[in-house]
Amino acid sequence: IIFGILLPSNKEGAAEGARQLSFTPDTLQNLFVIGAIFMGGLWFFSLLGEERRSTGAAAQAAENERTSSIWGDLKLVWSNRQTRLFFWFLALSMMFAFAQDPILEPFAGQVFAMDAAHTTRFAAYWGSTAILSTILFIWLGRRYPSLTNTRLSNVGVAMLALTFAIFGLSGLAQIRGLVTIGLVFLGVGLGIWNVGTLGMMMEMSPSRRAGTFLGFWTLVVTIFRGLGTSGAGIALDVLKSLTGGNLPLAYGSIFVACGVGLVVSLWALRQVNVKVFQSEQGIVEADTASVLAAGMD
């Protein structure tokens, strides 16, 4: 995740940035190899002190295991109103928040004539801010119980919507100084949203069906982030054609549309009630167990 945030968003930018910093291909290749080895070492280090699996718990889990189809699992997730609302929040926020990936650097380069040596650092700027914001709000969330995952998600998405409004105004009014402000807001908003949303994904996954629910949420994140990234690039090409090559209008319109999409996702989030969902799970799981038992009979 860290490498994905910090690396440039396009190959041309990466190559140009390397040229500007006088990196040779061999040096750059060595950097990637060393980075991969370092991250692999951290992964092995994270396993130290890992609790051993309890054989008694494993035997009990195997005894209670019931088979079900993937469609049955999806119906289980979709059958609850709270999970449907959370799905729309997760899908829309993921799609529109990362729509900036393929267009933010070209936006600065084409609208404000920034060179690649500067634009390729954008991901490092907002990515580093996002990491620091994530660490800070994890600590604050543990220290202050009032900072619930739902509240953090609300604040994070609201900041992201404001970020895209800033980028939209920057493009439409051609105010270069707003780009820097937008990068800071983007990093802080992503960090807060990351903490709150990951926490909500776990809260919206009942313990007995954690694999099913977490797998579904992860699938939603992957698919809709891809749709947002590809969709933004397609929309940019279409708007360039429709506006006769008016770059400020094309980029500004996409940023504004993303901001509106994030506001809609915020509305969906406001309808989600984690406590109601968790209180319903006893009934839902009992019904599911009876259906599965009848099927086995």
Regions found by a protein language model. Name each.
Residues 192-206:
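Intracellular juxtamembrane helix-capping segments at the cytosolic ends
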Residues 7, 133-150, 236:
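Helix-to-loop junctions at the C-terminal end of transmembrane segments
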Residues 176-194:
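Hydrophobic core of transmembrane alpha-helices in multi-pass small-molecule transporters
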Residues 1-99, 114, 259-297:
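Intracellular loop-helix junctions on the cytosolic face of multi-pass helical membrane proteins
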Residues 121-130, 221:
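Transmembrane alpha-helical segments of major facilitator superfamily
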Residues 102-119:
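Short amphipathic helix-loop junctions that connect adjacent transmembrane helices
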Residues 158-174:
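C-terminal ends and interior cores of transmembrane alpha-helices
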Residues 1, 116-117, 205-220:
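Loop-to-transmembrane helix entry/capping segments in MFS-fold secondary transporters
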